[in-house]
Amino acid sequence: MFKCPERVSIKKKEDILDLPNLVEVQIKSYKQFLQIGKLAEERENIGLEEVFREIFPIKSYNEATILEYLSYNLGVPKYSPEECIRRGITYSVTLKVRFRLTDETGIKEEEVYMGTIPIMTDKGTFIINGAERVVVSQVHRSPGINFEQEKHSKGNVLFSFRIIPYRGSWLEAVFDINDLIYIHIDRKKRRRKILAMTFIRALGYSTDADIIEEFFSVEERSLRLEKDFVALVGKVLADNVVDADSSLVYGKAGEKLSTAMLKRILDAGVQSLKIAVGADENHPIIKMLAKDPTDSYEAALKDFYRRLRPGEPATLVNARSTIMRLFFDAKRYNLGRVGRYKLNKKLGFPLDDETLSQVTLRKEDVIGALKYLIRLRMGDEKTSIDDIDHLANRRVRSVGELIQNHCRSGLARMEKIVRERMNLFDFSSDTLTPGKIISAKGLVSVLKDFFSRSQLSQFMDQTNPVAELTHKRRLSALGPGGLNRERAGFEVRDVHASHYGRICPIETPEGPNIGLITSLSSFAKINEFGFIETPYRVVRDGIVTDEIEYMTADVEEECVIAQASAELDEYDMFKTPVCWARYKGEAFEADTSTVTHMDVSPKQLVSVVTGLIPFLEHDDANRALMGSNMQRQAVPLLKTEAAIVGTGLEGRAAKDSGAIIVAQEDGVVEYVDSYEIVVAKKNNPTLKDRYQLKKFLRSNSGTCINQTPLCSVGDVVTHGDVLADGPATDKGELALGKNVLVAFMPWYGYNFEDAIIISERLIKQDAYTSIYIEEFELTARDTKLGKEEITRDIPNVSEEVLANLGEDGVVRIGAEVKPGDILVGKITPKSETELAPEERLLRAIFGEKAADVKDASLTVPPGTEGVVMDVKVFSRKDRLSKSDDELVEEAVHLKDLQKEYKSQLAQLKVEHREKLGALLLNEKAPAAIIHRRSADILVQEGAIFDQETIELLERESLVDLLMAPCDMYDVLKDILSSYETAVQRLEVNYKTEAEHIKEGDADLDHGVIRQVKVYVASKRKLQVGDKMAGRHGNKGVVSKIVPEADMPFLANGETVQMILNPLGVPSRMNLGQVLETHLGYAAKTAGIYVKTPVFEGFPESRIWDMMIEQGLPEDGKSYLFDGKTGERFDSKVVVGYIYMLKLSHLIADKIHARSIGPYSLVTQQPLGGKAQMGGQRFGEMEVWALEAYGVAHMLQEILTVKSDDVSGRTRIYESIVKGENLLRSGTPESFNVLIKEMQGLGLDVRPMVVDA
C-alpha cells in the first residue's frame, strides 16, 4: 500500500481543529433543500417542502374546490453520473407529488408526476446535458434593518433606516433638514414620500395620545399647588384635556403647555394632567404631530393611498387592502427567518423560535425602528449606524436556497393555471382529479432555465482538482438580485476586517470582477441564516481551552481574539502578559487577561488554494493573488510529482476535490485492476465495497481524467486511506507541477522580461508532457429529403482517404489522425436546387441514380492531431425491422439480465437480513413497533428480538413502521431506508438495461437515428511559447529550449534544468520563491519532503542550518559553469529546487496563420480571431509605420486586394494563376459602405467620373 510521504515540519503542535469538509457548502445546502432519505412526516419546513407548503392549498375563486399538498417523493437516478456525461443527458430523479382535491363530488387523493429535478453528485456538482456544472454561492445584502447617515448639501448629517425584506417592498425612513421623518416605499418611487406620522396612523395608531404613549413614557401630574403649576410650564401634553360637561378642548395631545393654557385648565377645575416625559417642541415626534395633515386612522389610510397611487380614487377598502398587501401578506412580503432575526437583534426584540417565525412586518417593528432612529439623531451612545460591507450585513445564498427561489416562482406560475382550470372545469361532463388540473411545465421550465442559463450556474472549471474545489467554494456578488460589475464601487470590492477567517483576502480574480468574486476561507462554515462563521478556541480564566466556538462577524465584534501564533506553555496558558489581539476589527497589543478567544490556526485567514503557497508570509499580496489563481490553471501532467516543499494542505485538497478514491470503510483489498478495486469489509467480509476507477475521460477543459490504483490485493485499508490516484495527484497528494533545479541568472538575454529558459532534458524525460482529449460528435437525422446515413461509401473520395474507416464508416480506435482526415463518413440527401443544370438534365434523361447524396462527413479541424482513443455509437433500434436472429439474441440477453437481477436482489436481501440481525438479534425493544396502517403491534415494548421477529420486520417498508424516538429506531430507519433505495436502484437499472436491449438508445433527441462520438487524444510536450509559473505569482513564457550540453552546470557536473531572471524578484517582492529554492535544495539533498504551513513555516535560520547539514553552500549560492564554453561565471548564483507548473495557456491553442479565409458580410474585410479562421489586422498605427518608410506598393496591396477590394481580389487571383504579377486595384468596399451611410443620413453622395 502506497503511503503519502510524511512531511517534515517545525510545528511543535498540530492544529487543534481539522479542516471541515471543503465541499460541505454545496452538499449540505442541497441536502437540506431536497431532504432525501427522510420520511414525508419527518421533513422540516425548509427547502422544497417549504415552497409546497407556501403555495398550497390552492382554492378556486368561489372556494368550492380546494387542492392541498400532502407530500413529495423522489425516485432514483436512471443512469450513473458517468453514463449521463457519456450520453449527454441530465443526472436527475423523478419528482412525484401527492395531492388531495376536495370539491362538491368528494375527496380524491392522487400522486402526480411533476417532471424531473437535477440532483447533485457526491462531489457537489450537477450534470446538465452531459456537462458538469457548479452552482456558485451568492453573497448579497442581508434582509433586515440598516441604519445609515448621509451628508446634506448644507452640511447637516441626515440619518435614515431601511427595512429590507427577503421578498417585497423596501421601507425607508429618512430625516429631512427640518428634523421631520419621511417614509419612502420602494426605492424606485423615492419621490412618493409620506410623513412618518401619517404612516404610523395608517398602521392603526389613530389618536395623537396613542402615538405619544408609544414613543414617550407618560406621567400623571397634579395641578393643586403653585409649584406644580410652575413645573408644568413648557411640558408637552400626552392626552387631550377635555371638559367633561361641555366637551370643550383646553389642550391637545402634543401641545406645549403655556401659562395661559394652564390657567384655563385650572379654571375649568381639572385636577391632573398627563405629561409626555422627555418631550419638547423640538422633538421630531412632536414636530411631526404638528405637521401631520391627518388626525385619524381612516384619513391617514386615504392620504397614504393617495400618495402611493396618485390619480386613483382613494376609498377606505382600497387603501386598507393596499397596505395589507404591501406589508402584512406573507405571500407578497416576507422578511424570512434571516430578516426577522436581524431586525429583532438590532431593535432588541426577543430571538426565540416563535418570534423568528413571524415573517411579515409588525407595527412594533416600525415603532421600534423609528425610536432607534430618533435616539441615533439625538446622539445616544448605545446606537450606531451600520456598515453595509460588514459581513454581519451580507449573507450567502447557497445552491439549495437559489433553487428554492426558482421553484417558488415556477409553482406560483402553476398556481394561476390551476386556479383557472378549477374555474373553467365542466363538472357535468367529467370528474375533477389533481392530475387534470396540475401542469408540471412551470416547475420543469424554471429549473431547466436556472441550470442552463443562470449567471450562477457555471460550467465547472475542471482544469485540475484545485480548480474544481475552488469553483465549488466560490462566492459571487454578481447574479440576479446581486450587484452589477459596472456599478459596483470600491468599498464593496475592498477587503473588510470582518472577512478575517470567513472570506479569503487574497484569492479573487484580476480585472473587472476583482473583489466581487471571492472564495471561502479554509475553516469557514455557513450557518442556518446564511452568515459565514469561523471557529475560535474559547479562553477561560487565562487558560486556552480545546472548546471550539463558531462565530458570525457581529458576535466577533464583542470579543478580544488572540492570534494562533501566540505562545502557550504546557498548561495552555499565555507565556507573555501581553499578546497581539483583535477587537472590533482593530489589531493591538492586549493584556492576556482580557483575551476571550484565540484563532484555531494561522491558515484560517486564507482559502485552500492560497494555503497551498509555501512561504506566503514572504510574498507581496498582489503576487500571492496571481499565485493562487495560476495554481488553478496548472495542467495535469503525464508523470505527476508531489512538491518537495509543501504546506500540508495538499492531501486534504486532493481528497475533498474528489480526484482520488478514498476507502469508505475499514477492510481488506480483495481485487484490483485498472478499472475496479474491491474491498471486503472488516466487520463482515461477505459484504464488498466496489470502487469504479475513471479511465481516460475528458474533463470540461479538455484535460485527461485518469485514475490509477495505489493498493495491491491483500492490503489492509482503514477508513480514509487513499486507494487510487487521480489527475494531478501523487500518492494521494496534490501534484500540479514538477520539482525543477533552477538557477537565477541572466543567460544570453533569453530570459528578458520574465522569459524562462529550459533544458532539453525536461523534454526528453517528458517532465511537462500532458494529454489533451478532444471530443467530436456527429449525428445522422431523419430529414425531409430522406434519412442521413453513416457509411464508408462516400462519393468522390479516394480509398486512400478512407483507409482508417471501418466497415460502418467510423474511424478505427488507434488511428493517427491529422487536420482534414475523415473521422466519421456521412452522406446526406441532396435537394433538387443543389444540383447543377447539367446534372438536372442527366437526371431527367436517365432517371434517379445513386449520386443524389452529398458528403457531410466529420473531419478533424485545423490545429488538432492525435490518436483516436475511443469511439461511442448510440443508435435507436427499429422494432418492426428486427430479423428472427436478432429477436432470438434479444430474448437470450433479456433472460441473462433477469437472472443477474434476481441474484443481485437475493444478495441484497441477505445483506439486509445480516444488518438487521447485527442490530436487533437478542436485543430488548426500547419501545413498541406498530404497523402504521393496520395499527397492529408488531413488537411489544421490552420484547426480545428473535429471528422470526427480524424476518417479519424485514418484509415491512419503512413508511409502515412506527416507533417512539430512540437510538435503535434511528439506526433501524437508516438500514431500512438504504435497503429500499438499493432495491429501487437495482430495479431502475434492470428496467433501463432491458429497455436498452429492446429499443437501443431511446433517449436520443427527436429525429436522431444515430449518434457517433469520437475522442482524439493528443500528447503535448513543453514547447517555446508555453506559459509556466511558480506558486508565488512568478510567471513567464518559455523562450528557448537549450540542449543539455549548453546549459550552465554545477561544480559536480549536474546541469541546471531551468534558468529564471533574477530581476523578476526585487520589484515583485515575492521572496517566497527564493526561500522555496533554498529549502527545496536542502530537502532534495536530504531526500525528505517538508511542509511550511502558511504563517508558521520554516524560519530563515532553520533553512541555513539545513543547508549546512547537507554540505551545501551557507548562502545558498553556487558557482556555475557555462555549458557552451566550460568557463566559470564570474558571480555566484542562487541554485535550488522550485516547484514549477505548466499552465493551460498553451501556444498550440493560440498560434494561428491564414492565407485566405472568410470575409465580413458588410465591410468585406477579413474576419478576426483563430476561431473564425481570421486574419491579422493591419491597423492605423501599422499603416503609419509603412507610410513613414514610403513603401507605396505594399501599402496599396494591404489596403485593397488583401482586404476589402472585392473585384481586385478576383483579378489578382486570376493574374497569379496565369503567372502574371499585375496589381490593378478597384474601389475598396469600405468606401461604398461610407457612401451608403451618408446616403442614409439624407446626403446625396455619388461618385462621378469627371473628364480631366
Curated annotation (Swiss-Prot):
UniProt keyword annotation of Transcription present: yes
GO BP term, pick one: DNA-templated transcription
Reaction equation(s) it catalyzes: RNA(n) + a ribonucleoside 5'-triphosphate = RNA(n+1) + diphosphate
Keywords: DNA-directed RNA polymerase, Nucleotidyltransferase, Transcription, Transferase
Listed SUPFAM superfamilies: beta and beta-prime subunits of DNA dependent RNA-polymerase
Gene3D superfamilies noted in UniProt: 2.40.50.100, 2.40.50.150, 3.90.1100.10, DNA-directed RNA polymerase, subunit 2, domain 6, RNA polymerase alpha subunit dimerisation domain, RNA polymerase Rpb2, domain 2
GO cellular component, one term: DNA-directed RNA polymerase complex
CDD domains the record matches: RNA_pol_B_RPB2
InterPro entries linked: DNA-dir_RNA_pol_bsu_external_1, DNA-dir_RNA_pol_su2, DNA-dir_RNAP_su2_dom, DNA-dir_RNAP_su2_hyb_sf, RNA_pol_bsu_bac, RNA_pol_bsu_CS, RNA_pol_bsu_protrusion, RNA_pol_Rpb2_2
GO molecular function, one term: DNA binding
UniProt enzyme class: transferase
EC number: 2.7.7.6
Similarity comment text for this entry: Belongs to the RNA polymerase beta chain family.
PANTHER family referenced in this protein's UniProt entry, alphabetically: DNA-DIRECTED RNA POLYMERASE I SUBUNIT 2 (PTHR20856)
Subunit structure: The RNAP catalytic core consists of 2 alpha, 1 beta, 1 beta' and 1 omega subunit. When a sigma factor is associated with the core the holoenzyme is formed, which can initiate transcription.
Function: DNA-dependent RNA polymerase catalyzes the transcription of DNA into RNA using the four ribonucleoside triphosphates as substrates.
NCBIfam families the UniProt entry points to: PRK00405.1, rpoB
Protein's name according to its UniProt entry: DNA-directed RNA polymerase subunit beta
Phylogenetic lineage: Bacteria, Pseudomonadati, Chlamydiota, Chlamydiia, Chlamydiales
